[in-house]
Amino acid sequence: QADCVMVSIHSHELGGLRKDVPAEFLVTFARACIDAGANVVLGHGPHVLRGIERYHGGAIFYSLGNFLFENDTTTHQPADFYEKYGLPHDAQVGAGMDCRSKNGTVGLGVNPNVWHSVVACWSMENGEIGLIKLHPITLHQELPRYRRGLPALTEDETVLHELAELCKPFGTELSIRDGIGYV
């Protein structure tokens, strides 16, 4: 008994070679969750946005991307992390991150798509998902390591236009008005 039943699924698996396309099993699973009574399925894991689908009165967010992205600012890592990069056990985490990313030239941190996302909110109407609003956020890839990764609303609509394209294969139309996406 709930006003809104939400299912959270963490999935890195790709649809083909594209990180922004969900694997087929995820589509099947998410739809089965709605069929079983969930109102919303919230996907996360690939660090990038994936499309949104309205399905049988529910909403499926195949991935909402990153809301926070502070991999480089953790205070501790396990011993094998330091061993992997040939660093002493008392090395700073940042030194390990620099080794892992080859000084910021490879890995997730160089992908601009992991540094922007949306905050989704919706209304409920007679037990079904009503209007979905999508507020674009930035995690400030351009800032120094110690300041990036925290979300802030942005007026840049680029992420909304990209998300609109990702929604099309699911038959979902995303419109943009005054810096907010609507589904």
What is each of the regions a protein language model found here?
Residues A2, H56-G58, I129:
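Short coil/turn connectors at secondary-structure junctions
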Residues M6, Y62, W122:
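Conserved, mostly hydrophobic/aromatic
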Residues H10-L14, H47, G65-F67, I137:
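Active-site beta-loop-alpha junctions enriched in small/polar residues
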Residues Q1-R18:
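Short acidic, glycine-rich surface-loop motifs adjacent to enzyme active sites
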Residues H76-V183:
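A short C-terminal boundary segment appended to hydrolase-like catalytic domains
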Residues G16, G51, E70-N71, G130-L131, ...:
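Short active-site-adjacent structural elements
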Residues V21-V118:
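Conserved beta-sheet core of the metallophosphoesterase superfamily
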